[in-house]
Amino acid sequence: SLVGSEMCIRDRLKKYGITHCVLSAGSRNVPFVHSIEEDPEFHCYSVVDERSAGYFALGLAQELNQPVVISCTSSTATCNYWPPVAEAFYQGVPIVVLTSDRDPEMLGQWEDQMIDQVGMYDRHVRKSVNLPIINNHDDEIYCQRLVNEALMELNHHGTGPVHINVPMKSYNNSFNVKTLPEVTKFDRLCLDDSDALWKEKIEKLKKAKRILVTCGQGSFVSSALQESLNEFFKKYNSAVSVEYMSNIEIEEGLNLNVCMDARYVIPKKVKEFLPDIVISFGGNIFAGIKEQFRKFAGEFEHWLVQ
C-alpha cells in the first residue's frame, strides 16, 4: 500500500540516525508531528515560534554534533525560518528544514495564505527538493529518491542545512496505518572511506548469488578496466552487460539490448532472474533493462560507480 510523503520522510530520518526534531505545530504538518511524537525513537521539542525554533535547533545540532530537524506548517510560517537557515548555512550546521505546503495546483489561485515555497531558501541550503504528491508507486519511488538525495547532502564535502518541501492536497488525520514497508537508504562510499565500510561491500558480494554488472556508454576504455572486469567476472561468477556504445570487449559479455526488450520479456520472467546486486558504471544504458528493473525497485541493491 502507498504511504504519504510525511511517512516516507519519517522512516528515512530513522535510517540516517536523525532523531532530534524541533516542532512548530500547525495544521499542515500535523501528520508528521503526530507520527514522530508517537515513535519512541524520536526526541521532540515543541517551540511554537518558527524563528525561535530554528535557532534552538541550530544550537541543539551544535551541542549534539549531529543533524536536527525543524518542521513547520505551510505559507508565511516558512518565511520565519529564513534567519536561522542562513545562519546554519554560513556556520555549516546540518539542519533538515521540513516545510509543509498546500496543493501545488492552487498556487496563484487565491488559496488562503499560499505562497511559492519551492526552493525558497535558494543558495542558503546545500540541497532543496520538492516532493511529489503520492498517487502511485512511481510517485512513491520518486519521493524516496528525493528524500535520500537531500539527507545525503547534509554532510557531503562539508556540512549545512537542506530543505525538503512537502506539498499535500489535504492531510490525513486518521492515523490508522499500523505498519510501514521497509525503506531504502542511499549510502555514499568514497575511496578514502574506512576499510571496514569497504569490507561490508566485499562480504555482500561474497554472499550474493546473482550479480549483474552493466556497462554504460563510454568513448575510452582503458586496458586496466577491461582486465579488472574480466577478473571480477571470474571471481564472483557475475553476468556482464555490454552494449555497442560501451566500447568494451568481454568474451562472456551479454548484449541485453537484444534479449531484454520490454516488448518481449514479461515482468514475471524478469523477476525469476532478478539479480541480488546490480553494479553499473559509464554513461547512458540504452537497453530496456532499466525499464524492466524499475518495476522491482527495492528488491535488489544497485551500486552506481562514478
Residue spans for each PLM region:
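Short, small-residue-biased leader/transition segments that mark boundaries at the very start
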Residues: 2-8
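Conserved thiamine diphosphate
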Residues: 66, 113-160
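Thiamine diphosphate
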Residues: 30-104, 274-277, 282, 286
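Glycine-rich phosphate/diphosphate-binding loops that line cofactor/substrate pockets in enzymes
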Residues: 10-18, 60-65, 151-158, 197-212, ...
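Glycine-rich beta-alpha junction loops
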Residues: 102, 166-172, 217-219, 246
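Hydrophobic or amphipathic alpha-helical targeting/insertion segments
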Residues: 78-79, 85-128, 157, 161
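Conformationally flexible catalytic loops at phosphate/diphosphate-handling active centers
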Residues: 146-149, 153-208
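Glycine-rich, anion-gripping cofactor-binding loops and their flanking helix/strand elements
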Residues: 80, 215-305
